[in-house]
Curated annotation (Swiss-Prot):
GO terms for cellular component: chromosome; cytoplasm; DNA-directed RNA polymerase complex. Keywords: Chromosome, Cytoplasm, DNA-binding, DNA-directed RNA polymerase, Nucleotidyltransferase, Transcription, Transferase. This is DNA-directed RNA polymerase subunit Rpo1C. It catalyses: RNA(n) + a ribonucleoside 5'-triphosphate = RNA(n+1) + diphosphate. It comes from the Archaea. GO terms for biological process: DNA-templated transcription. Part of the RNA polymerase complex. It is found in: Cytoplasm; Chromosome. GO terms for molecular function: DNA binding; DNA-directed RNA polymerase activity. InterPro entries: DNA-dir_RpoC_beta_prime, RNA_pol_Rpb1_5, RPO1C. Pfam families: RNA_pol_Rpb1_5 (PF04998). The keyword tRNA processing does not apply.
C-alpha cells in the first residue's frame, strides 16, 4: 500500500488540469485503501489518465463552434414542439422540448412556465405535515383563491365574497386574518366578516365602474406567500418530501424558514444569475439544456453545451445567441452584416471608419479567402536555397 503523500506527489507531476488532478487523487486514495495498490500500478493509472486526457483534447484549429451548433441542432430537430407535463408532477405544466431550448439560448428573462424545486432542511424534509407548513409559507394565496362565490351588490354598492372554509383552513388563514390583511392594504374600503362571508364597502364610490375596479384589486390582492408563486405541490422523493412550485421567486424562497438553500433550484436562469452569480447561471444553462435533451431521450456530449454556456456568460452577464446578443456584438463588421440587417451594419461601420481584421470564418468566406480553421490556421513560409546574386 502506497502512502498518501507519495500518491499526491505522483499526481502533482502529471500534466493534467487541477480539477482532474483533484478527482484522480481522490479516486486513487479510495482504490488504494480498497485494493492495496503498488506504486507501479498507481503510475500506470496516472499514465492512462494522461493518455485519455490528451486523446480528448481538440486539435488546434478545430471548428468547435460549427461542431457544437451541429451537435445540438441536429438532435433538436427530433424534439417535440409542444408543452408537456413535468416528469412526475402531473399537476404542474412546464415547457419542454424545442420551445425550452429556444427559451434558454434566447436568454428570455421570463420563462413561459417558471418552476422551483424546493428542498427542505433536516427538520422538515421527512415529515409531510412539516413540509406542508413550509409549502403554506411559500404558496401565494389571493382572495380569489379562497372564494367560493362572489357578487357585486349594486343596491348597497358592496362587493360580497363567500369564502370556502376548506380552502381557508388549507391556506392556514382565518377570517380575522383576512380582514386584518385587507384593512391594512386598502384605505379606500371597509371590510367586515359575517361568518364566512366577506363584505367589502368602498368609501366614496358612486359609480359601478369604480366598485368593479376596487373589487378586481381586492380579489387579486396577495394575502400570504411569495409574490410570483402560485400553487405548490408536495411530492415524496426517496425518503424525503420535496415542494414544487408554479411560478418562481428564488431570492425570497431561500429566506423561508425550513428551506434548504443549498439544494433549492429554479428554472429561471436570470434569477440564478442575480442571486447566486454568473458561474451558477452558467451551470444552470448547461443543466437545463442537458435535462431537456435527456427528457426527449437525446444524448449530446456535454462539452458542446458547455461551449454554448461559456459564450453566453463570457462577459459576466447572460447574453442571448442572436442579433441582440453574441452574434450581433461580434468584432467583425462583415460577420455582423452577413448575419442580419446588412446595410445598417455596413453604413454604421463606414460612418465610424471601422476596420475588419478578418479573423473569423464568415468574413473570410465573404471575401473569398481561406478560412482560419483547420489547415487554414497554419501559415507556411518556404525556405529557398540561397543563390548568389547575378551581376
Amino acid at each position: 500500500m502506497v502512502a498518501e503523500k507519495t500518491i499526491k506527489s505522483m499526481v502533482s507531476k502529471a500534466e493534467l488540469p487541477d480539477n482532474i488532478k483533484e478527482e484522480l487523487y481522490a479516486k486513487l486514495i479510495e482504490y488504494n485503501e480498497k485494493y492495496k495498490l503498488k506504486k507501479d500500478e498507481i503510475q500506470a493509472i496516472i499514465d492512462e489518465t494522461v493518455r485519455e486526457y490528451q486523446k480528448a483534447l481538440i486539435e488546434p484549429g478545430e471548428a468547435v463552434g460549427t461542431v457544437a451548433a451541429q451537435s445540438i441542432g441536429e438532435p433538436s430537430t427530433q424534439m417535440t414542439l409542444n408543452t408537456f407535463h413535468y416528469a412526475g408532477v402531473a399537476e404542474i405544466n412546464v415547457t419542454l422540448g424545442l420551445p425550452r431550448i429556444i427559451e434558454i439560448v434566447d436568454a428570455r428573462k421570463n420563462p413561459s412556465t417558471p418552476i422551483m424545486t424546493v428542498y427542505l432542511d433536516e427538520e422538515h424534509r421527512y415529515d409531510r405535515d412539516k413540509a406542508l407548513e413550509v409549502a403554506r409559507r411559500i404558496e401565494g394565496t389571493t382572495l380569489e383563491n379562497l372564494a367560493r362565490e362572489e357578487t357585486i351588490d349594486i343596491l348597497n354598492m358592496e362587493y360580497v365574497v363567500e369564502i370556502d372554509p376548506e380552502r381557508l383552513e388549507k391556506a392556514g388563514l382565518d377570517m380575522e386574518k383576512v380582514v386584518r390583511k385587507l384593512t391594512g392594504s386598502f384605505k379606500s374600503a371597509e371590510f367586515e366578516a359575517e361568518g364566512y362571508t366577506l363584505v367589502v364597502r368602498p368609501k366614496k364610490v358612486t359609480k359601478l365602474s369604480d366598485l368593479r375596479k376596487i373589487a378586481e384589486k381586492v380579489k387579486k390582492h396577495r394575502l400570504k406567500g411569495l409574490s410570483g408563486v402560485g400553487k405548490t405541490i408536495i411530492r415524496k422523493e426517496g425518503d424525503e418530501y420535496v415542494i414544487y412550485t408554479e411560478g418562481s421567486n428564488f431570492k425570497q424562497v431561500l429566506k423561508v424558514p425550513g428551506v434548504d438553500p443549498t439544494r433549492t433550484r429554479t428554472n429561471n436562469i436570470w434569477e440564478i444569475a442575480e442571486v447566486l452569480g454568473i458561474e451558477a447561471a452558467r451551470n444552470a444553462i448547461i443543466d437545463e439544456i442537458v435535462s431537456t435533451m435527456r427528457e426527449q431521450g437525446l444524448e449530446v456530449d456535454v462539452r458542446h453545451i458547455m461551449l454554448v454556456a461559456d459564450m453566453m456568460t463570457l462577459d459576466g452577464v447572460i447574453r442571448p445567441i442572436g442579433r441582440h446578443g453574441i452574434v450581433g456584438e461580434k468584432a467583425s463588421v462583415l460577420a455582423r452584416a452577413a448575419f442580419e440587417i446588412t446595410t445598417q451594419h455596413l453604413f454604421a461601420a463606414a460612418e465610424r471608419g471601422e476596420v475588419d481584421p478578418l479573423n473569423g470564418v464568415v468574413e473570410n468566406v465573404l471575401i473569398g479567402q481561406p478560412v482560419p480553421v483547420g489547415t487554414g490556421i497554419v501559415k507556411l513560409a518556404m525556405s529557398l536555397p540561397l543563390r548568389p546574386k547575378r551581376e
